[in-house]
Amino acid sequence: MSKIVGIDLGTTHSAIAVVEAGMPGILADAEGRRLLPSVVHFPANGEPVVGVAAKRIQTVEPERTVVSAKRFMGRSENSLVKGEAASPVEVSALILKELRAQAEAALGESVDRAVITVPAYFNDAQRQATKLAGEQAGWKVERIINEPTAAALACGLQGLPEGDQVAVYDLGGGTFDLSILELREGVFQVLATHGNTALGGDDVDAAIAEWLETKVEGELDATGKARIREAAEQAKIALSSSDEYRIQLPFLKPDFSLEVNFSRADLESLARPILEQTKTHCRQALTDAGMKSTDLSQVILVGGQTRMPLVRRLVAEWFECAEYEEVRGDVRLGDSFHSADGPVLNTGVNPDEAVALGASIQGAVLSGEMTSTLLLDVTPLSLGVETFGGLMNVIIPRNSTIPAKAGEMFTNAVDGQRAMLVHVLQGERERAADNWSLGRFELEFESAPRGGARVGVQFEIDADGILQVLARDTTTGREKIVPIQSAVDVSDDRVQEMVEESVEHAFEDMDARRWVEAALKADEAVKAARDGLEAFRDELDNAQIIDEAIAAVEGLLQSADNDQGDLPALKAAVARLDQVTLPLADLIMDRAMEAMLRKQGVLD
């Protein structure tokens, strides 16, 4: 039976995922991008442009570019661009068609069966419109499922005790909903949902853009406003991990360039009134379900906007969440995953990818590739693998019920790599060296450029506590399976010792992780800049400035000592490199667009 993929058709971004070798994974495009902007541009001549290229063109021709079409699904059949076949369904179909091409390129085979997600509060007309869009894109839509149900599947919550109730707080780019789910006989049932189809991260972007426009003298044209909006989104994203961001918009008008410092405090003062609107929906959903917040076992955060620290603080406050620490993006609560003091704030799943991953799991169940299992005991400590940079990547979190199965897709870190060392770890620390090593083995695969290989690593613990680790090259099907006996057989004293160590060293561990992750990102930025310079140096006026920015980043990386360095300085240097390479990025995109238009016969 052919694969059934999972699709999150989002307001601002969309994603597609599939289960391979028992592991759900996002299917990235040829450039490694895991999210597709839900943006479609309709040129005056030629075929529509979808995704990243359309988003770039938006700043030049905003009137011919459609964003947030999901907000209009099932509500209007009118074209969103004058003179074009651009109804909400038709725009969504183009996005879904692009996702199909992306999936087929990643998998190397034809796919035409999909599970597509919708907000829980979508009415029948909106659901039918979504299904119609899928069919127009060439998909056989096997099922339309609710986004909160998909998110719960991605979190592995089918292993919760019977009758457990969870809330899914889903704040995306253009929509918000709060859903209360209950697990009944292994199936999630929606007890209540409340939301707003016109409330999301777009509104925060608009508030920032409005604030920025007050810094501009006189009126802006459509292109200027589009540039302001793009800068607003970039600032919002940056301030999820930084306290300060400098917005620079050269020649916003012929005689005016905008440069302004924008802080996290500024962002939160603008965002708070918008986020406070979600509180009413949260309360109403709880009332409709006849519950209070302390009846919940978890509150799951989904949607890219929930990366904002203010969102997490507000949700934790509204739902009276228990004390929690964010470690590796997961939640640690001491001896019990559940807390008597309130629900767990679950931040352990990538908020941008959870819905697509969950939809792919549903697709795998429908195709017979996955089946439900009886869940019994729990894992005493987290299990994972060492990743590039010497960090631990958790596959099965501590206190997961067993039998349990989970996995992730990994890729090669360097060009020409022919094998991957799988180092299996157990523990609660950030750095691999601080956790217990359970074993190592190597899987060979076809030589590929950096990021070209796809190796799935799956952990499966049976009811006897025996861990089997499978690594599979999804291109050739080559695999290795290694049994490990000691994954669950750990004394209470040793467990307590590890947990106490993780708490004692939490801050230094997180500092080390932040540095390593920032350093890896910096290394990628330097490599991309060097590659671009090699191809286009002669066409750039600021090549020397880019060289200097690269040298600044490399100097900070070389001065680091034992996973410790000047993190604020490194982030600032990378931000500077990103800024000075904007002309290079535009040049690369222009050349790519020219090549695409020539291929389509639009240019000679």
Range-by-range predicted roles:
Residues M1-F72, L80-A85, L94, E104-D604:
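Oxyanion-binding/catalytic loops of NTP- or PPi-dependent enzymes
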Residues V89, K97-E104:
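Short, charged beta->alpha transition segments
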